[in-house]
Amino acid sequence: MAKAKFERTKPHVNIGTIGHVDHGKTTLTAAITKVLALKGKAQFMAYDQIDKAPEERERGITINTAHVEYETDARHYAHVDCPGHADYVKNMITGAAQMDGAILVVSAADGPMPQTREHILLARQVNVPYIVVFLNKVDMVDDPELIELVEMEVRELLSKYGYPGDEVPIVKGSALKALESTSQDPNAPEYQCILELMDAVDKYIPTPQRDIDKPFLMPIEDVFSITGRGTVVTGRVERGTLKTGEEVEIVGFAPEPRKTVVTGIEMFRKVLDEAVAGDNVGCLLRGIQKNEVERGQVLAKPGTIKPHTKFKAQVYVLTKEEGGRHTPFFNGYRPQFYFRTTDVTGTITLPEGVEMCMPGDNVEMTVELISPIAIESGLRFAIREGGRTVGAGSVTTIIE
């Protein structure tokens, strides 16, 4: 059986379901595939297929995530759904599944619950830019005023965490009714809420800027000296494009970036005119000695990224079962922070009133590195100690 070819005809968007346990995230995910399958735009995935998601390892952390794909008339979607609450926390902080937008599922019968809040806060911290709400289980609420009340609560909660609560689309319905319906007609009344939701997702969550359209950045993995030609740095282009003859900055390990010109680009020993996001390339740098550039620095379009030493981050601390620490750590803890291609020592300051951090915790902290690194908001990192990963984090704010 030949593999189906991925046809890139529609814009692609990554989304996921978030929300409190038992509010219907997985039921909704299954219902979306069912209704879109009736329109010939998805393969139906039953609840059990999604719920028994295989374990994945991302940066040494075990995460259960279900990946589902489907299409609307407008776009192609990759949708992630996590069975357990801890899986969500890990998923969002490690960026195992980067989301361009999220569907927040809230039960109309219960209203917002603790994990509803936690997921909204996490989404904000790790830069999930847009949220669409599905108010589920409305068939279980007799009083329409109660539904209105829950809707107001959800809007207030979103506004509290920095989302435009008044503008966010809220679609009401019953995912279970849609999933259990026997109708083969995609326009049956019980499917309307699902079609309405996908229409809101199509319209409200913008197609993200592709990596190739962003400013050039390449983390340096290795440095070589080629006799008679100069210094070559190698790495995988993270974003943007680079043409021979363009000026770049070497950023990191020094207070100020250093400018140079890329005089040649090679891939698989062949000369390239242009490198694009995803390419593994070697770049020949003009006027740079081998000892003036090192792994852990980045090559970047001038003026687009600066070296920093101090930032705030949201961090998930691994449990001992995940290979993390067996004991808590305290204020002033000094592990290694692994950014892109290298480790840098840094000191942790916990928030006021927080004495220590236990394995399994999800915590906000301030970090001060001993040398400046090319950092920007949203950058992921691992916290390591003696070569093993003990935490995973995402930069939320740059301080200096």
Swiss-Prot record:
Residues 10-209 form the tr-type G domain. The keyword Magnesium applies. It catalyses: GTP + H2O = GDP + phosphate + H(+). Pfam families: GTP_EFTU (PF00009), GTP_EFTU_D2 (PF03144), GTP_EFTU_D3 (PF03143). InterPro entries: EF-Tu_GTP-bd, EF-Tu_GTPase, EFTu-like_2, EFTU_2, G_TR_CS, P-loop_NTPase, Small_GTP-bd, T_Tr_GTP-bd_dom. Residues 136-139 are annotated as: G4. Residues 81-84 are annotated as: G3. Residues 19-26 are annotated as: G1. Residues 60-64 are annotated as: G2. PROSITE patterns: G_TR_1, G_TR_2. It is found in: Cytoplasm. One of its GO terms (cellular component) is cytosol. Mg(2+) binds at residue 26. GTP binds at residues 19-26, 81-85, 136-139. Keywords: Cytoplasm, Elongation factor, GTP-binding, Hydrolase, Magnesium, Metal-binding, Nucleotide-binding, Protein biosynthesis. The keyword Magnesium applies. Belongs to the TRAFAC class translation factor GTPase superfamily. Classic translation factor GTPase family. EF-Tu/EF-1A subfamily. Monomer. PANTHER family: ELONGATION FACTOR TU, MITOCHONDRIAL (PTHR43721:SF22), ELONGATION FACTOR TU-RELATED (PTHR43721). NCBIfam families: EF-Tu, PRK00049.1, PRK12735.1, PRK12736.1, small_GTP. GTP hydrolase that promotes the GTP-dependent binding of aminoacyl-tRNA to the A-site of ribosomes during protein biosynthesis. This is Elongation factor Tu. It comes from Caldicellulosiruptor bescii (strain ATCC BAA-1888 / DSM 6725 / KCTC 15123 / Z-1320) (Anaerocellum thermophilum). The lineage of its organism: Bacteria, Bacillati, Bacillota, Bacillota incertae sedis, Caldicellulosiruptorales.
